[in-house]
Amino acid sequence: MNRPWSPDSWRALPIQQQPNYPDAAHLLKVEQTLASYPPLVFAGEARELRRQFAEVTEGRAFLLQGGDCAESFAEFSAAKIRDTFKVLLQMAIVMTFAAGCPVVKVGRMAGQFAKPRSSGDETIGDITLPAYRGDIVNGIGFDAKSRIPDPERLLQAYHQATASLNLLRAFAQGGFADLHQVHKWNLDFIANSALADKYHQLANRIDETLAFMRACGLDSAPQLRETSFFTAHEALLLNYEEAFVRQDSLTGDYYDCSAHMLWIGDRTRQLDGAHVEFLRGVHNPIGVKVGPSMNPEELIRLIDTLNPANDPGRLNLIVRMGASKVGDHLPGLIRTVVREGRKVLWSSDPMHGNTIKASSGYKTRDFAQILGEVKQFFQVHEAEGTYAGGIHIEMTGQNVTECIGGARPITEDGLSDRYHTHCDPRMNADQSLELAFLIAETLKQVRR
């Protein structure tokens, strides 16, 4: 692609999934205010994540990405951030030990406020209103006032993201991520799990390793008490994203400093569209959701547009096919990418292709289908001789009842007990950890 890029060049192209703000002058003022604020992350941090992505692409690390479907203003609290961060740490230690390689930890946090919708409107009875597009755009209440897009919400999202990042950095570097403590949390989980016998062997081996390190005097090393943690969200509201574009003083490259990583959704990946145009010019590591409608030729064009230098740390293909489709659609895409010599990080999003409506009316996901898609993702890569590099999940550290199934199964009738999501159903802490142990077993076999 030869046309020049600038932070606002996306504005000249067709754009999908954007709210209709009634007051353009108000929106412009808020955009200018955001642009004057300090960045949320720094270019050097995004460069470091890009380096770590390259390690994953080359098969020397594994990517764990998880967090909320859509962050909420009303439910924002230190406890919720802590609990999600804690579960991600617990998942990571299990995977690290089983795989024998570093696990790159990226949270869908501190910016995952906006959501694409299948329809621009929502109808209940004989009333039709604009769809809820996330707290950064409008309110979830089904009334005319709540559903009006409000630019002031962009500012509130920034301030919440700032507070979230401040807390996450403190957790990552302040001792909360101590390996011994994280392992103790996992032991507590195992003790109360229906699959305790299955997990004890791995837990005992981790115990022995930590005891050996303690005996060698290695238990006080900073690497055991601190961790690297990065943030990511879907780059959906481009006026918000543009406000955080900064030119790096060291390299001259542009970075979107709203998060370390950004991704393009399956609904906004048009080659001639604004979202691809915006992300092709920022030097963050980026992702693209790859659904069953993606064909091999389109995928190669997207890869070449977003990663023309074929840098192994630049592009994450996040596969979200559904358990019933991934086995049919993924092999052809992998073969084309390999044949064309493109370097990409393949990860599995087993959530978005497996959403169903329960008989009770709740939107849900079946844990068996989630696990089924992950297993097929690994099987396809093994058959093709390529590396299954990561997992991308919607989860929470809270004890919600939004996805059915699991070792302590949630039934369709039980969904209403603690169904709190503002958008799509999330795995709870127990389901997330169960998935981590099951992935760990697969990683152990793959990396022998």
Role assignments for model-derived ranges:
Residues 1-62:
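N-terminal basic/disordered segments at the start of proteins
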Residues 18-21, 53-66, 123-141:
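Short, compositionally biased low-complexity segments
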Residues 48-50, 272-275, 302, 331-333:
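Glycine-rich, charged/polar anion/phosphate-binding loops
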Residues 62-68, 280-282, 311-313, 352-357:
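Short acidic (Asp/Glu) and glycine-rich catalytic loops that position anionic groups and cofactors
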Residues 64-69, 106-109, 348-351, 394-396:
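Short loop/turn segments at strand-loop or loop-helix junctions that form parts
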Residues 71, 76-322, 365, 390-392, ...:
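Active-site-facing alpha/beta catalytic cores
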Residues 173-178, 344, 348-352:
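An internal, amphipathic alpha-helical element
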Residues 299-308, 314-345, 352-404:
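Non-transmembrane, aqueous-exposed alpha-helical and coiled segments at domain scale
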